[in-house]
């Protein structure tokens, strides 16, 4: 009888272990449902950020200013001469940007979206040195109808008219690029750049008031590009191809300074007609700052649920060995209730970390 009793106990323990394993697999169902709920909340938050960006202004990337010059190209086709216009793009020798960002929080339902208003002072100078090094015939360039171009990601972010002071003359920008820009979105001004032909430097200065959301980036078009940025935000994430040389982050704000040389990037100062490879190099050379929220609650909730199966397994293991050591019987329903309580805990974690309209 003693041997039969021992075999029955070993058999019942094996059955109990199988039942516990089945319960753990069963509890994966509510955990997957909780993970799906967290993912759905995260997607809704992303949609809310995009919706606010569509109404306020999207993340901004500032590319420019740069000069576009037209020149005639004569081709013969069956004895007939055909004249088309080519493009020469001249990037600045020096590009200096001094920016001040004023951030604020907007709401869409229970979600918070960080937006900003910026004041940017852009200055530097152009010269014809790189033009003379290129294979362009300087005499055929149309200096009197040159274009100063500035590309922006979202034109709705402009808060006032934009002008540029170029060699002591003021020019107003017009909407659109008129087919003369590195990218299609932006503004341009038709200017007289005859001074370039005379080997003179062309100093420029412009001020922009620009709205955006989430982040702001800059393109290092200058032979030397310097950017100094300040903002009343204490959790910046510096992003892009270049990190700031100097940075200071306090409890209330941050400041950062970048310096990028033309040797640090993979495109020249002069483009003869636009090439897709060169444009892609320009687009990939951006740098800037992402204004991160202090707490990404759904990301934290998702991380915690990844450990749920491990927590349930360890809890059931402790209970099972306690049952063996103390020689007591714990019903499978009690295991199930403990597991459901752990699942409920993660549901409460999601509820607790979700923002409320009063936050």
Predicted regions mapped to residue ranges:
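Soluble non-transmembrane domains of integral membrane proteins
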Residues: 47, 54, 64, 68, ...
